[in-house]
Amino acid sequence: MFTDCSSSTTSRLIHLYNRNGVFLPRPSVSQFSLRTTASTWRCTLSIRSSSSPSAIVIDGKAEAKKIRDDIKIEVSRMKESIGVVPAEDSSEEEVLKYVSGFNDDPSVHGVLVQLPLPSHMDEQNILNAVSIEKDVDGFHPLNIGRLAMRGREPLFVPCTPKGCIELLHRYNIEFKGKRAVVIGRSNIVGMPAALLLQKEDATVSIIHSRTMNPEELTRQADILISAVGKPNMVRGSWIKPGAVLIDVGIKPVEDPSAAGGERLVGDICYVEASKIASAITPVPGDVGPMTIAMLLSNTLTSAKRIHNFQ
């Protein structure tokens, strides 16, 4: 039998023998290598006896991971060339000029101001300067205002609170009629999280630094979101049996047994709470990655909106 390879002009002879009406290659033939004249492509045909299968496993998953890793490197390079990191002593006017340039650039779909800003800058003034159509962080006053109003939808929702609610949805947690408690009232997490829980028809309470006997409220919570950055503040005795706990807080504490002498913990005492709650997010690990995922989701939403893609 003659073989043909599309990149070769030379035919090759393979010896066959008949076994019960089926033509099979002779086991003695071991390998043929067919090359192009430019030696840029190689076709190797291995023929072995059926008694010794040793085919190479083509691992698509492993190769796909390598490709994704390569893409990550390229995306990182692009971010470095597109994004701007002003010097810490930059003036507010310089930062506003950068923001204005990104607002006007049609190739930019999202603008994010990394907080906190240096003390000599007016944080609210700079956040207000970001176009609401590109406010993928969701902190523009108009986006927060729409989030607070019934019948209005913000163009973007703040990423960490959005990630908390998305986690609950993906684990089929029921909201309607449930008692939800949010610890913390920051503009970044606490207040938006409370507003989102209200939109889900939960009955919401907010605990802050002036709340008396906070544990009395948390013991009633079917859903508890904590975002204050106080290590292990929420003890097991604060938790209603079967509650669902989302721990946004993260803080380093001393631990001689850990690398560097420190480890990261959340607001909720995980060891105690995990024995009482029906579901809990570990720290570090769950909410942080969800924040990044929601930022990417918001940026994709912005790009689709700009290009009128449904």
From Swiss-Prot:
Name the gene that codes for it: FOLD3
- Can you tell which superkingdom this protein's organism belongs to? Eukaryota
Pfam families to which the protein is assigned, alphabetical: THF_DHG_CYH (PF00763), THF_DHG_CYH_C (PF02882)
Kindly tell me the pathway this chain contributes to: One-carbon metabolism; tetrahydrofolate interconversion
Q: Where is it mainly found?
A: plastid
Answer yes or no on keyword rRNA processing: no
Has the keyword DNA-binding been applied to this entry?
Answer: no
Q: How does it assemble?
A: Homodimer.
Question: What is the name of the protein in this document?
Answer: Bifunctional protein FolD 3, chloroplastic
What this chain does, per the record?
Catalyzes the oxidation of 5,10-methylenetetrahydrofolate to 5,10-methenyltetrahydrofolate and then the hydrolysis of 5,10-methenyltetrahydrofolate to 10-formyltetrahydrofolate.
Q: Where is the transit peptide?
A: 1-48
Highest classification ranks of the organism: Eukaryota, Viridiplantae, Streptophyta, Embryophyta, Tracheophyta
Q: Tell me the Gene Ontology biological-process terms attached to this UniProt entry.
A: photorespiration; tetrahydrofolate interconversion
**EC number from the UniProt entry:** 1.5.1.5, 3.5.4.9
Q: Which UniProt keywords apply?
A: Chloroplast, Hydrolase, Multifunctional enzyme, NADP, One-carbon metabolism, Oxidoreductase, Photorespiration, Plastid, Transit peptide
Provide the protein's localization. Plastid, Chloroplast
Q: Which InterPro entries does this one have?
A: Aminoacid_DH-like_N_sf, NAD(P)-bd_dom_sf, THF_DH/CycHdrlase, THF_DH/CycHdrlase_cat_dom, THF_DH/CycHdrlase_NAD-bd_dom
Catalytic activity reads: (6R)-5,10-methylene-5,6,7,8-tetrahydrofolate + NADP(+) = (6R)-5,10-methenyltetrahydrofolate + NADPH; (6R)-5,10-methenyltetrahydrofolate + H2O = (6R)-10-formyltetrahydrofolate + H(+)
